[in-house]
């Protein structure tokens, strides 16, 4: 697929131009709205997911913003979880609030609370299928049933599990948002986000295609679309290795916790807890298998003694990169409390269950023995 860096497009006739600009014919007229390279990526994702429409944006946050802008307006509210990505929380509670849109953050595991929170002014139900970094799994079918009973869409951020490995549509999701910066890009070479629309609410296509793309101006660049089209070609193979590495790593780290306790190692040099939804003793494991199959993603967390221990651990890593991205080909580590949730108060972090003892690991394609050894040496180096 060639990369069309063209900003504008020449037409054969005045009528052709008028038809394109007025939406009577879907054809590229200006690359803020349509671009052949970006459309190729959109069409590929559409074929992979069975979606009615796919829209590619310049980042994951742009995709989230545009999906919510379809439904959010003054006097409306968005019902969502206490557990959300930090920038999504800020978008809802800081940016949208200024325009008269209320956010109601509740425990989505309490289905009665979800029903009670939705009223005649609710625009949508929004969630992450697996929360970051809490690793809480949403019951998509149950929440979709509630949303549809109330006549509102279920919008789900599905970035944590690729759409090639589970069907959000079959679980009742109306609109998926995906940070294509993550698994799809793979090598952290491009930013992007996708809105995947399953057609249950026709207003999505109408507003994004003919309003938001024109007026907001956050369409994906052709270069990013080209890079991510290449990433899609290897997504399945990469994800299988990353998910298997994550499961193997989680199991070995659990064994390390037990061995360290049996050997009475110094408390500061211990992994206190391992959280991964692929582990059979994880409280969300059964639901995760039901929804996502046998693969459980490439994100896990470990808990250490305190923040000082976490910083020491990160500083002593030799193979794993200190970076904020997720689902890169390379393994990454971050301290969420002080970084992606850094701007929030201690009280807000407590409400979101973000602890200063937690390290988030994104497991890459390296040899799993090397990843494990790097974690162990960094833990044992904690003073």
Q: Can you describe what each PLM-predicted range is?
A:
Residues 1, 36, 327-329, 333-336:
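Positively charged, small/polar-rich N-terminal and surface patches that mediate targeting and assembly
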Residues 1-4, 195:
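Short conserved active-site loop signatures built around small residues
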Residues 7-12, 182, 234, 278-282, ...:
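Glycine-rich beta-alpha junction loops
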Residues 8-65, 87-96:
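Conserved N-terminal alpha-helix of the aminotransferase class I/II PLP-enzyme fold
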Residues 53-275:
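Conserved PLP-enzyme active-site core in the AAT-like
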Residues 93, 102, 116, 308, ...:
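PLP-dependent enzyme catalytic core of the Aspartate aminotransferase-like
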Residues 227-237, 297-305, 360-364:
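Short, well-ordered beta-strand elements within core beta-sheets of diverse protein domains
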Residues 247-330, 344-352:
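Conserved small-domain helix->loop->beta segment predominantly found in fold-type I
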């Amino acid at each position: 697929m060639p990369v069309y860096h063209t900003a504008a497009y020449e037409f054969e006739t005045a009528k052709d131009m008028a038809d394109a600009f007025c939406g009577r014919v879907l054809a590229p007229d200006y690359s803020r709205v349509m671009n052949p390279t970006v459309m190729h990526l959109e069409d590929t994702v559409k074929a992979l997911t069975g979606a009615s429409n796919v829209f590619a944006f310049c980042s994951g946050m742009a995709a989230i913003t545009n999906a919510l802008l379809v439904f959010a307006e003054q006097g409306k509210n968005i019902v969502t979880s206490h557990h959300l990505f930090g920038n999504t929380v800020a978008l809802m509670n800081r940016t949208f609030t200024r325009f008269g849109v209320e956010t109601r953050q509740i425990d989505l595991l309490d289905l009665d609370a979800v029903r009670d929170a939705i009223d005649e002014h609710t625009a949508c139900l929004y969630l992450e299928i697996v929360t970051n970094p809490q690793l809480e799994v949403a019951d998509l079918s149950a929440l979709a049933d509630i949303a549809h009973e109330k006549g509102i869409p279920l919008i789900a951020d599905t970035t944590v599990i690729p759409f090639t490995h589970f069907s959000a549509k079959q679980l009742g999701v109306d609109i998926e948002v995906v940070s294509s910066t993550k698994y799809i890009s793979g090598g952290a070479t491009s930013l992007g986000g996708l809105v995947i629309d399953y057609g249950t609410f026709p207003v999505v296509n109408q507003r994004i295609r003919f309003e938001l793309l024109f007026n907001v101006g956050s369409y994906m660049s052709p270069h990013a679309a080209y890079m991510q089209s290449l990433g899609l070609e290897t997504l399945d193979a990469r994800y299988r290795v990353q998910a298997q590495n994550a499961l193997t790593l989680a199991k070995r780290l659990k064994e390390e916790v037990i061995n360290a306790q049996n050997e009475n190692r110094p408390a500061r040099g211990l992994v206190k807890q391992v959280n991964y939804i692929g582990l059979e003793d994880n409280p969300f494991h059964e639901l995760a298998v039901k929804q996502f199959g046998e693969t459980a993603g490439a994100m896990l967390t470990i808990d250490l003694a305190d923040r000082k221990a976490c910083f020491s651990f990160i500083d002593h890593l030799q193979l794993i990169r200190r970076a904020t991205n997720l689902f890169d080909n390379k393994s990454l580590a971050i301290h969420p409390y002080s970084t992606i949730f850094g701007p929030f108060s201690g009280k807000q972090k407590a409400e979101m269950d973000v602890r200063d003892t937690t390290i988030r690991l994104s497991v890459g394609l390296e040899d799993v023995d090397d990843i494990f050894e790097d974690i162990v040496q960094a833990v044992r180096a904690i003073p």
